[in-house]
């Protein structure tokens, strides 16, 4: 049975003051989530550090109905060998791939899209690079949000079963 794995947001290239990246560190019904700054320059980046090196197997991305990223690149990072204090800024990242999201015009911005990416990589860090937002009449500030990040692992093997990021 999967269980939640601890993580913290360790890097953010920008944030809306009302929706700081630190909101992702606690997953509660009252969490507001992170959002890119208004009229920001893309790409935007968010970095997550796990409590320990883990075998990441799946990423799920759930888009917001109107504030939609066009493309999100996924990277898994490892600490530099011999580094006594691993840091996101010094990590070696390997590109796992990307997801493209539908602009959602056909549903009149009523639906949310769920994407699942399967991969197998050991890492201490996860980097998500948001390339730009879909321009539409409801996204007046050209933003992309992340509502929550839930990371699960197998309790005994300490492998990720999935990471869910709601964008």
Residue ranges and their predicted role:
Residues 68-87:
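Short, surface-exposed beta-strand/strand-loop-strand elements in extracellular ectodomains
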Residues 29, 51-55, 64, 77-79, ...:
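Short amphipathic alpha-helices and their capping/turn residues within compact interaction modules
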Residues 1-51, 64, 159-161, 165-167:
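Disordered, acidic Ser/Thr/Pro-rich linker "stalks" and the adjacent N-terminal cap
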Residues 11, 61, 76, 130, ...:
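Hydrophobic side chains in beta-strands
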Residues 86-115:
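Extracellular carbohydrate recognition and processing domains
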Residues 45-48, 55-62, 110-146:
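Hydrophobic/aromatic beta-strand segments within beta-rich folds
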Residues 9, 48, 72-74, 99, ...:
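Hydrophobic beta-strand residues in large extracellular and virion-surface proteins
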Residues 135-166:
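Edge beta-strands of jelly-roll/beta-sandwich modules across compartments, strongly enriched
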């Amino acid at each position: 049975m999967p269980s939640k794995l601890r993580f913290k947001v360790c890097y953010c290239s920008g944030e809306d003051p009302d929706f700081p990246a630190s909101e992702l560190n606690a997953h509660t019904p009252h969490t507001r989530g992170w959002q890119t700054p208004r009229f920001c320059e893309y790409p935007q980046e968010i970095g997550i550090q796990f409590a320990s090196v883990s075998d990441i197997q799946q990423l799920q991305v759930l888009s917001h109905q109107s504030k939609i990223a066009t493309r999100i690149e996924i990277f898994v990072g490892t600490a530099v060998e011999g580094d006594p204090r691993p840091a996101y800024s010094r990590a070696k990242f390997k590109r796992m791939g990307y997801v493209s999201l539908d602009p959602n015009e056909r549903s009149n911005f009523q639906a949310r899209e769920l994407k699942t990416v399967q991969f197998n990589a050991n890492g201490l860090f996860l980097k998500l690079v948001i390339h730009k937002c879909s321009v539409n009449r409801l996204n007046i500030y050209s933003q992309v949000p992340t509502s929550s990040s839930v990371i699960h692992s197998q309790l005994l093997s300490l492998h990720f079963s999935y990471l869910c990021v709601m964008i």
